[in-house]
């Protein structure tokens, strides 16, 4: 009889309703907050991941890209897929790596075609006009290298690696 009396309060405590104010993600049985990549599955599934070229459950690589491909079961590394870190030479650079929070905000307008024209051609046109080196149609008698470019050549030069178009 004494045992029954002890069991009843325990049963009543289990039936109480509670309100949880914490997030569902903080729960005891929530495994979403743990990264368990490549840990789940049977031995058969893990062996299939290792041996098959296209396994039913892909191996999670945690964001690292392959630097090659599988050809006839052999891994062939492709040099173009290996990332290169290009570090510019900053000797003689007057810019400092740290910008103070007290520095004023710099607002720059959008770079337009007029700005590009003024940066590249305007000075040469003004000098040619003052020196009288313009023809009757307004073109230069002695054109510069940039003025001699055709539209196709200018587009090709702008798309070339190392240009500051992007």
Swiss-Prot record:
Domain of life: Eukaryota
InterPro entries listed in its UniProt record: Ribosomal_mL41
Region ranges (Disordered): 136-166
Major location (coarse): mitochondrion
Keywords: Mitochondrion, Ribonucleoprotein, Ribosomal protein, Transit peptide
UniProt record, GO biological process: mitochondrial translation; translation
Keyword Transit peptide (UniProt): yes
Compartment(s) of residence: Mitochondrion
Pfam families in UniProt: MRP-L27
GO molecular function: structural constituent of ribosome
GO cellular component, one term: ribonucleoprotein complex
Transit peptide residue numbers: 1-26
Similarity field: Belongs to the mitochondrion-specific ribosomal protein mL41 family.
Subunit structure comment from the entry: Component of the mitochondrial ribosome large subunit (39S) which comprises a 16S rRNA and about 50 distinct proteins.
Protein name: Large ribosomal subunit protein mL41
Species in which this protein is naturally found: Drosophila melanogaster
Annotated gene: mRpL41
């Amino acid at each position: 009889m004494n045992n029954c009396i002890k069991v009843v309060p325990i049963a009543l405590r289990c039936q109480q309703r509670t309100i949880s104010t914490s997030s569902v993600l903080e729960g005891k049985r929530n495994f979403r907050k743990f990264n368990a990549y490549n840990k789940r599955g049977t031995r058969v599934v893990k062996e299939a991941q290792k041996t098959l070229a296209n396994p039913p459950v892909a191996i999670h690589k945690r964001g690292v890209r392959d630097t090659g491909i599988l050809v006839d079961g052999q891994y062939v590394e492709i040099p173009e897929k290996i990332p290169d870190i290009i570090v510019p030479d900053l000797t003689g650079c007057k810019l400092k790596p740290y910008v103070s929070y007290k520095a004023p905000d710099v607002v720059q307008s959008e770079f337009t075609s007029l700005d590009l024209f003024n940066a590249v051609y305007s000075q040469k046109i003004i000098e040619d006009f003052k020196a009288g080196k313009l023809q009757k149609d307004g073109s230069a008698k002695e054109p510069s290298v940039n003025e001699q470019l055709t539209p196709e050549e200018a587009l090709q030069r702008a798309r070339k690696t190392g240009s500051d178009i992007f």
